[in-house]
């Protein structure tokens, strides 16, 4: 029987800060990704330092990297790192029940007109996720604990429970359920642009990943058949996202020398 989720109340100042982030208009919302990548970098630093004295700490996932994966179908943007990750108590304490010393100071600064982009300097950058998401899940696996998932749609509380989904090995996966008016952040080109702008400041590879596709010319009839095949396979497709270099699109409609109308479709490979 699956473990019941435990519900926790956000510490009062954190709840106030989240309300301020959610209910105030900020123009430079993209800073959320810089903050989450920065947190991923810190987690990678921690496991790297710890492994210097105990190399076995890296065994569960040796590669040190961060990836951002937009998924238009699910309406999510996922940020994954192979850093030190969080135990259950880390999730409870660090993401809601114990206010960082900068929480109140940052709220006061915001109300005095400070820019939202300063959030990281106060140690509460994680909550910037709620600039563009109305629900956030944080799945994490630390070497010293089982895998747990934290979840909150704000509203004053969050849940934590044991997670039996795909094992991370070690690290953290943050899934942002993007608000309906923020779907720009599901565009791979937009994510790549922000990652390129901010990831130059971290010492690890930060990739934007997507399902890889290529253009293939087919006749209209073949295109219909391909579409049916693709729909039949969609539920069974469990391939990992792949890094994609975006190239130029070719003309969508062409005719071959027999006069048949050609269509360019996307083919997974």
Curated annotation (Swiss-Prot):
Residues 206-269 are annotated as: Disordered. Residues 209-218, 225-245 have a biased composition (Basic and acidic residues). Changing residue 79 to V: In strain: Bogota70. Residues 260-269 have a biased composition (Basic residues). CDD domains: HATPase_Hsp90-like. Its main location: cytoplasm. It is found in: Cytoplasm. Keywords: ATP-binding, Chaperone, Cytoplasm, Nucleotide-binding, Stress response. GO terms for cellular component: cytoplasm. The keyword Cytoplasm applies. Homodimer. Interacts with shu. PANTHER family: HEAT SHOCK PROTEIN 90 FAMILY MEMBER. Molecular chaperone that promotes the maturation, structural maintenance and proper regulation of specific target proteins involved for instance in cell cycle control and signal transduction. Undergoes a functional cycle that is linked to its ATPase activity. This cycle probably induces conformational changes in the client proteins, thereby causing their activation. Interacts dynamically with various co-chaperones that modulate its substrate recognition, ATPase cycle and chaperone function. Required for piRNA biogenesis by facilitating loading of piRNAs into PIWI proteins. This is Heat shock protein 83. The gene is Hsp83.
């Amino acid at each position: 029987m699956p473990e019941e989720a435990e519900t926790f109340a956000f510490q009062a100042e954190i709840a106030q800060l989240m309300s301020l982030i959610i209910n105030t208009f900020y123009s430079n919302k993209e800073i959320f990704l810089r903050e989450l990548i920065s947190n991923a970098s810190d987690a990678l630093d921690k496991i790297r330092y710890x492994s210097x004295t105990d190399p076995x700490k890296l065994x569960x996932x040796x590669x040190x990297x961060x990836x951002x994966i937009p998924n238009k179908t699910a309406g999510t943007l996922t940020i994954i790192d192979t850093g030190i990750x969080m135990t259950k108590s880390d999730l409870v304490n660090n993401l809601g029940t114990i206010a960082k010393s900068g929480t109140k100071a940052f709220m006061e600064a915001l109300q005095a007109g400070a820019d939202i982009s300063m959030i990281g300097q106060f140690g509460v950058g994680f909550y910037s996720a709620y600039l563009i998401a109305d629900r956030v899940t944080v799945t994490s696996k630390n070497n010293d604990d089982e895998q747990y998932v934290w979840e909150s749609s704000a509203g004053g509380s969050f849940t934590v429970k044991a997670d039996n989904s795909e094992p991370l090995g070690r690290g953290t996966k943050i899934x942002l359920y993007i608000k309906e008016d923020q779907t720009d952040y599901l565009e791979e080109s937009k994510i790549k642009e922000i990652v390129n702008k901010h990831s130059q400041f971290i010492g690890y590879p930060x990739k934007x990943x997507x399902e890889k596709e290529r253009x293939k010319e087919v006749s209209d009839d073949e295109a219909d058949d391909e579409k049916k095949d693709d729909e039949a396979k969609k539920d069974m497709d469990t391939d990992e996202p792949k890094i994609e270099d975006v190239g130029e699109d070719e003309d969508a409609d062409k005719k071959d020398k027999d006069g048949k109308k050609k269509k360019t479709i996307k083919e997974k490979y």
